[in-house]
Amino acid sequence: MGGPYTILTAAAVPERVAAGVSLHGANLVTDKPDSPHLLIPKLKASYYFGIATNDDQRQPDAKDKLREAFTAAHLPAKIEVYDGCQHGWCVSDGMVYNKVGAERAYDHEITLYKKVLV
């Protein structure tokens, strides 16, 4: 649920959002007319998406549709699948927490924020 809200928020107030991150986000790409990925042309933000292995297995085309949408909007976005990490891998007290994957994801997040917001 969090991943879609980063896009919805950035599309609602694009002048106030310069960077967004989605870690183990789901439902970023749907067949519905209100799919978050369809709002990407409204954004002015750089993005980082860390996708869990099992989320990628459920929607193997989602990452490609995200890349296509960001490319068409001329916006920078890095999109990666975290092999071996399951949905929720960044939640430190969660059942599928993966410390190595979480630290890598947080490093990408901090790098993006430093690049765009500082």
Task: Locate the predicted segments by residue.
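N-terminal cap/leader regions of alpha/beta-hydrolase-fold enzymes
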Residues: 1-118
